[in-house]
Amino acid sequence: MQKARIKLSSTQHTELDGVCDQIKAIAEKTGVDMSGPIPLPTKALKVTTRKSTDGEGSSSFDRWTMRVHKRVIDIEADERTMKHIMKVRIPDTVQIEIELRN
């Protein structure tokens, strides 16, 4: 049977966990084997910018960070389960990638 690897990433971990819970509920309802959601390391993207635009005055900086949270779910990919997963409402902040494997 084919397996599907579902990769999810988002900057909002609560919305990401909500989508993972929906996929987990679908797997339990249809009775397919599932492993995950496996949390991958959170990537912190940092940008430091100088507050003063003209270069004069004291050197003060703004530090901005954005954290990207990732999850991986492996699931058996029968047709009924995949149709249910495709109908899940995904928030705009969550990116999803589905890869089918033999």
UniProtKB/Swiss-Prot annotation:
Cross-referenced Pfam families, in alphabetical order? Answer: Ribosomal_S10
Which residues are listed as membrane-spanning? none
Q: Look up keyword Ribosomal protein and say if it applies.
A: yes
Q: Name one GO molecular function term.
A: structural constituent of ribosome
**Annotated region Disordered: where?**
32-61
Gene Ontology biological-process annotations: translation
Record keywords: Cytoplasm included?
no
Q: Which Gene3D superfamilies match?
A: Ribosomal protein S10 domain
Entry GO terms, CC: small ribosomal subunit
Q: What keywords were assigned to this record?
A: Ribonucleoprotein, Ribosomal protein
Function (record text): Involved in the binding of tRNA to the ribosomes.
Note the subunit structure: Part of the 30S ribosomal subunit.
The UniProt entry's sequence similarity note says:
Belongs to the universal ribosomal protein uS10 family.
Instruction: Identify this protein by name.
Output: Small ribosomal subunit protein uS10
By which gene is this protein encoded?
A: rps10
